[in-house]
Amino acid sequence: MKTLLLTLVVVTIVCLDLGNSLKCYVSREGETQTCPEGEKLCEKYAVSYFHDGRWRYRYECTSACHRGPYNVCCSTDLCNK
């Protein structure tokens, strides 16, 4: 009985920890970050346009995403590539 109780406690702790560990890309080079509490979305959004036709993007964890035709807003690990 004690083993079952201990197992349930461990599973609960692991599940609670997984709920707060969203990971997002924070750079074009592939650097990642575990998002702070309250920021449950990953985002990639266009911040400027280069003369050669390319967009410059910003990658981050966020609580609310920017709107735009070239932006990505998602809620799973490493989804904002």
UniProtKB/Swiss-Prot annotation:
Protein name in UniProt:
Mipartoxin-1A
> What is the role of the protein in this entry?
Snake venom neurotoxin that blocks neuromuscular transmission, presenting a postsynaptic action through the nicotinic acetylcholine receptor (nAChR). Has no cytotoxic activity.
Species source reads Micrurus mipartitus (Red-tailed coral snake)
* The entry's keywords: Acetylcholine receptor inhibiting toxin, Disulfide bond, Ion channel impairing toxin, Neurotoxin, Postsynaptic neurotoxin, Secreted, Signal, Toxin
Q: Which GO terms describe its cellular component?
A: extracellular region
- Cellular compartment(s): Secreted
Q: Please give the tissue specificity annotation from the record for this chain.
A: Expressed by the venom gland.
- An MF annotation (GO) of this entry: toxin activity
